[in-house]
Regions:
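Periplasmic alpha-helical coiled-coil/stalk elements that build and connect Gram-negative outer-membrane
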Residues: 157-270, 372-375, 379-382, 399, ...
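A short glycine-centered flexible hinge/capping loop motif at secondary-structure junctions
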Residues: 199-203, 404-408, 445
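N-terminal signal peptide c-region/cleavage motif recognized by signal peptidases
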Residues: 16-17
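Sec/SRP-type N-terminal targeting helices
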Residues: 50-54, 67-68, 112-117, 129-157, ...
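Regulatory alphaC helix of protein kinase catalytic domains
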Residues: 25-39
Length: 451
């Protein structure tokens, strides 16, 4: 079943309707927009889509930050200090022996150990060794978070696109109902006029005249309700697409084609393999697995780093002004009151939770696909029924118009038949768009973006 082939019927149904959403007599020219353009605008300007994109960027930068831990780090440590006092060293005369029979030193001396103002500066390069194992696990966690954020962003994109489709269809349906209601009002007014004349000549009861008046007012009330609904839908569509809320829109009734769906079981398998929600859940499992490995590594593997340092000092005793230092640094917690093991148990619980959530999401996706598939089949059947109803209403209206020309039918009867045909057209349009909407929901359930 193709939507494009139904565009003429949509246009014919809407020709007497408002057509332009949100337009007032003094408003600017409406903006013509197609369904595809509305979806593109929403994906470009919608706040939820933009927020999801920023979340992906955030996780990507977090991954880059974790990756940088693989490489050596260089940092400088400098100090300027003022001492209140220093230790003095006294060397007595002759304490160092004699030189050519004379005591050395010849007299006692008092030496100061350095100055009271100290300057020290060191630049050190550090390369993690055993910590690389922990860094790898941290990078696995960051990579899983990136995957999850991308899947969630895709899910947000699918939801926003589906919402645009639903509101777009709702506007077209409301416009069709607007036309049908106007036709009903005209028919009710004709009946009311005839009843008034019949009451004057005694051919009808006054109660029938009152009833026809009530029907006319009820139709006008429905028209006002439809107008209010159109206004609300226009605001919602503008909000979804990122347009100013007061933008008047002229919606293109041609909404593309419905593609043939895959067999039911094949659809379920495809959805489980590619649905963004399942992919996000799988990424959470990968993240939890990496977190468990990191916790185990943190328990058993000490932190070993290789470092090299170049230092400069002034007034620090017993050190050269410039010197280098090279070595290995090892750090290991001998006792932490069970903290690391508790963290490991926490990560294992999170892993179990992530696996259970994956199973839950998989079941939910299968349910969504089955439900959407059933709805697609039902709406297709409803579409066929609506087509038959329209054919009968069209034939009835044709007969009534011919009888009106021959004088065998009243004007109100012909107007009622026309109104019923308009209602049948609106019903068919609603069935068509319900079928299209069901297909879009099916596409979303499969994990794809409705176009």
């Amino acid at each position: 079943m193709k939507r494009k082939a139904l565009a003429l019927l949509v246009a014919a149904t809407l020709w007497t309707s408002p057509g332009v959403v949100g337009q007032t007599p003094n408003s600017a020219a409406p903006r013509h927009i197609t369904l595809h353009e509305a979806v593109e605008l929403a994906l470009k300007h919608n706040h939820d889509v933009r927020l999801a994109g920023f979340s992906v960027d955030e996780k990507q930068h977090a991954k880059e930050a974790e990756k940088s831990s693989y490489f050596p780090s260089i940092h400088n440590d400098s100090n300027l200090a003022r001492l209140t006092d220093t230790q003095l060293i006294q060397i007595n005369a002759g304490s160092l022996g004699t030189v050519n029979g004379a005591p050395f030193p010849a007299e006692s001396s008092i030496l100061n150990q350095g100055g009271r103002t100290l300057t020290a500066s060191g630049t050190q390069i550090t390369q993690p060794l055993t910590s690389l194992l922990k860094i790898r696990r941290a990078n696995d966690i960051a990579e899983a978070e990136v995957k999850a954020s991308r899947s969630k962003a895709q899910l947000t994109t699918n939801d926003v696109a589906l919402a645009v489709h639903e509101v777009y269809y709702a506007v077209l349906i409301a416009q069709a109902h607007h036309s049908a209601t106007e036709a009903r009002i005209q028919a009710a007014q004709d009946i009311e006029s005839e009843r008034v004349q019949q009451v004057k000549f005694g051919a009808s009861l006054e109660q029938e005249s009152i009833e026809s008046r009530a029907n006319s007012l009820q139709a006008q009330q429905e028209l006002l309700t439809t107008d209010l609904q159109l206004t609300d839908l226009q605001l919602k569509l503008n909000d979804l697409t990122g347009l100013p809320l007061n933008t008047a829109l002229d919606l293109d009734p041609s909404v593309g084609e419905v593609q043939e769906s895959c067999p039911r079981e094949e659809c379920v398998v495809t959805a489980k393999n590619s649905h963004p929600e399942i992919q996000a859940a799988r990424a959470e499992v990968e993240k939890a697995v990496a977190a468990v490995r990191l916790a185990k590594t943190d328990i058993w593997v000490p932190d070993v780093d290789a470092f090299g340092r170049y230092s400069y000092q002034n007034n620090v005793p017993f050190l050269a002004r410039n010197f280098g230092t090279f070595g290995i640094h090892l750090s290991y917690d001998l006792f932490d009151a069970g903290h690391k093991h508790a963290v490991l148990h926490e990560r294992e619980s999170q892993l179990s939770e992530a696996k259970e959530n994956l199973a839950k999401v998989s079941d939910e996706v299968e349910l969504q696909v089955q439900t959407a598939y059933n709805k697609l089949e039902r709406t297709q059947q409803m579409l066929k029924v609506s087509e038959e109803i329209l054919a009968l209403r069209h034939e009835s209206n044709r007969v009534q118009q011919q009888e009106l020309l021959r004088g065998a039918a009243l004007k109100s009867q012909a107007a009622t038949a026309s109104a019923q045909e308009f209602e049948a057209k609106a019903l068919l349009l609603q069935s068509q768009l319900d079928y299209a909407r069901a297909h879009d929901e099916f596409v979303r359930a499969m994990g794809a973006t409705p176009e």
